[in-house]
């Protein structure tokens, strides 16, 4: 896939809407943070030092050992414009930090976008694996094999006592950040979500919005991840996250059953109102779109709205974002223009689906 196609293609592997528990778990993500010994952290590096890190990382990515498993294409942040960077953020392929603050940053992408390797973000290397559904172990297996290939060629910053050294203290140790993106509309509707979020903080996990730290949980989407890596093994981190996520999944299912059994008419009314608005509205702002799409997604998962694939809703999560809308238009848009284009895009996509029924 060409660099241009990564920006224009609305589809990523994680949007498939398949895999274990995919009615609730939109995606699973694993990140591994690594730094190179005798190289300043990216925040302190000069341009030439940062360029040297990119060169070393891309040499390994082009090696026979890596190419046997993954064909990766490098995109340099200083060679793409702000809208293109924003599209990559909205597709969850790079972090806002790499897009906005990194000096001489780059990302290496696999064609199906399930693997992305950020270079010169907060750390020299951040390996990301992003899969559809609840697939922590599979994400770990892919990520650790990539990490092994890098470690054979690069001299990692590692301390026998502390583990892998990272720029952020919360990543020191294993350097692993695992997360699952959960769609929890029923827990929000039944007003149980606050209690659950408070309990999560007490077991070493944290909940953020869909774009990570500081972002809002739009469309009833919550990102659950481990908070620290020091003093815990990789298996401990993954098993703890798996266990808590499994409990939340079951509680969401119980809440959905309750809504169906006790408030079915009002639930269906809410779902079909949102579906109708998305089918016919002429303008829709981003927060409303996220909420309406959440309602429709719930209707699909409960069988209330038939013959619509979750893939369509996952795709719209990205294509209705400001960056993608503007990049697709080929120009910057005012908020009103974005709202109009967003509504038109949703109408067209849903009508294509209806015509295929």
From Swiss-Prot:
Catalytic reaction list: L-arginyl-[protein] + ATP = N(omega)-phospho-L-arginyl-[protein] + ADP + H(+)
Pfam families in alphabetical order: ATP-gua_Ptrans
CC annotations in GO: extracellular space
Enzyme class: transferase
Residue interval(s) of motif RDXXRA motif of the pArg binding pocket involved in allosteric regulation: 338-343
UniProt key word Cytoplasm: no
UniProt cross-references to InterPro entries, sorted A to Z: Arg_Kinase (IPR023660), ATP-guanido_PTrfase (IPR000749), ATP-guanido_PTrfase_AS (IPR022415), ATP-guanido_PTrfase_cat (IPR022414), Gln_synth/guanido_kin_cat_dom (IPR014746)
Enzyme Commission code(s) on record: 2.7.14.1
Domain of life: Bacteria
Gene Ontology MF annotations: ATP binding; creatine kinase activity; protein kinase activity
Record domain Phosphagen kinase C-terminal: where: 24-255
Alphabetically ordered keywords of this record: Allosteric enzyme, ATP-binding, Kinase, Nucleotide-binding, Transferase
Residues binding ATP, per UniProt: 27-31, 92, 126, 177-181, 208-213
GO biological process: phosphocreatine biosynthetic process
Activity regulation comment: Appears to be allosterically activated by the binding of pArg-containing polypeptides to the pArg-binding pocket localized in the C-terminal domain of McsB.
PROSITE patterns: PHOSPHAGEN_KINASE (PS00112), PHOSPHAGEN_KINASE_C (PS51510)
This protein's record includes keyword Transferase: yes
Function in brief: Catalyzes the specific phosphorylation of arginine residues in proteins.
Similarity-based family: Belongs to the ATP:guanido phosphotransferase family.
HAMAP family per record: Prot_Arg_kinase (MF_00602)
Protein name: Protein-arginine kinase
Lineage, uppermost ranks: Bacteria, Bacillati, Bacillota, Bacilli, Bacillales
């Amino acid at each position: 896939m060409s660099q241009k196609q990564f920006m224009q293609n609305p589809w990523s592997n994680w949007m498939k809407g398949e895999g274990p528990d995919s009615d609730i778990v939109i995606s699973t993500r694993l990140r591994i943070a690594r730094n190179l010994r005798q190289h300043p952290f990216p925040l302190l590096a000069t341009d030439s030092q940062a360029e040297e890190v990119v060169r070393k990382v891309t040499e390994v990515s082009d090696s026979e050992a890596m190419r046997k498993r993954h064909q990766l294409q490098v995109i340099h942040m200083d060679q793409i414009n702000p809208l293109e960077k924003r599209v990559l953020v909205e597709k969850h392929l790079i972090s806002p930090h790499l897009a906005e603050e990194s000096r001489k940053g780059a990302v290496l992408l696999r064609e199906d976008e399930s693997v992305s390797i950020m270079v010169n973000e907060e750390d020299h290397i951040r390996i990301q694996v992003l899969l559809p559904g609840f697939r922590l172990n599979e994400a770990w297996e892919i990520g650790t094999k990539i990490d092994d290939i890098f470690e054979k060629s690069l001299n990692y910053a590692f301390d026998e006592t502390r583990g892998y050294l990272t720029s952020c203290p919360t990543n020191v140790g294993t350097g692993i950040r695992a997360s699952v993106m959960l769609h929890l509309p029923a827990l929000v509707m039944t007003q149980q979500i606050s209690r659950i979020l408070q309990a999560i903080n007490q077991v070493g996990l944290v909940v953020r919005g869909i774009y990570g730290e500081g972002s809002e949980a739009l469309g009833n989407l919550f990102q659950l991840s481990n908070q620290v890596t020091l003093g815990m093994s990789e298996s401990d981190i993954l098993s703890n996250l798996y266990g808590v996520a499994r409990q939340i999944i079951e509680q969401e299912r119980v809440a959905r059953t309750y809504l169906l059994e006790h408030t079915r008419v009002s639930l269906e009314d809410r779902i079909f109102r949102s579906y109708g608005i998305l089918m016919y509205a002429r303008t829709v702002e981003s927060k409303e779109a996220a909420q309406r799409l959440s309602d429709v997604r719930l209707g699909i998962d409960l069988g209330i709205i038939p013959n619509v694939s979750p893939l369509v809703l996952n795709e719209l999560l990205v294509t209705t974002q400001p960056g993608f809308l503007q990049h697709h238009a080929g120009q910057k848009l005012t908020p009103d223009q974005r709202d109009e284009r967003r509504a038109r895009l949703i109408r067209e996509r849903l009508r294509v689906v209806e015509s295929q029924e």
